[in-house]
Amino acid sequence: SMLLALRALAADEVDACVSSGNTGALIGLARHCCGTFEGVRTVAICAQLPNLNHPSYLLDVGANVDCTASQLHQFARMGCGLVSSLYPLDQTHGQKPTVRALSIGVESGKGNQAVTDAVALCADDASMDFAGLIEANQLLMDDCDVVVCDGFTGNIALKACEGTANYIRRYVQQALPENPRQSSG
């Protein structure tokens, strides 16, 4: 069960916990059994996105529909911690993970108040290389390590990426003959 797996994780008997159960239940049990990192009050769901050079990590993708600037900043710090634990520093952009905030434009001041205020918090945080805003059409093309957003926006962006990938796969499958030798003439 989820509870047993999370207790094993909290006791350092295992390195990770994977579940196909209810996400809300998993998050609640994880907070109860494992707690959170110091200074982190809000849980976020993180998704790995493919990228041209290395994966990016998008968070939140569904745990928090509305977020404050402080929560978005916490997500950025959690994402940086994840990237730093997975990859040696020389495999990221520099000595610190690169962070962007998902918004409706890349110009300064774009986005809602939480995003605008989070930009200031992240820009002042010496633990990360904050690279500004990013639009959804660049999620799979940009070299940033971490992208932060509220769970509503992140879930929509993730589902749009998944849907586009499924469309391309189906389109290619329909365009190719069932037997590739048939088209070789």
Give the positions of each predicted feature.
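N-terminal glycine-rich phosphate/adenylate-binding segment common to multiple enzyme folds
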Residues: 1-44
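Short acidic, glycine/serine/threonine-rich loops at helix termini
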Residues: 28-33, 70-71, 111-115, 158-162
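Structural motif
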Residues: 14-17, 24-25, 55-58, 97-101, ...
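Glycine-rich phosphate/nucleotide-binding loop
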Residues: 31-58, 142-147, 151-185
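Short glycine-rich anion-binding loops that position phosphate/pyrophosphate groups of nucleotides
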Residues: 22-25, 32, 106-107, 152-155
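Glycine-rich phosphate/diphosphate-binding loop of Rossmann-like nucleotide-binding domains
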Residues: 66-132, 136, 145
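Glycine-rich oxoanion-binding loops at beta->alpha junctions
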Residues: 1-13, 65-68, 133-141
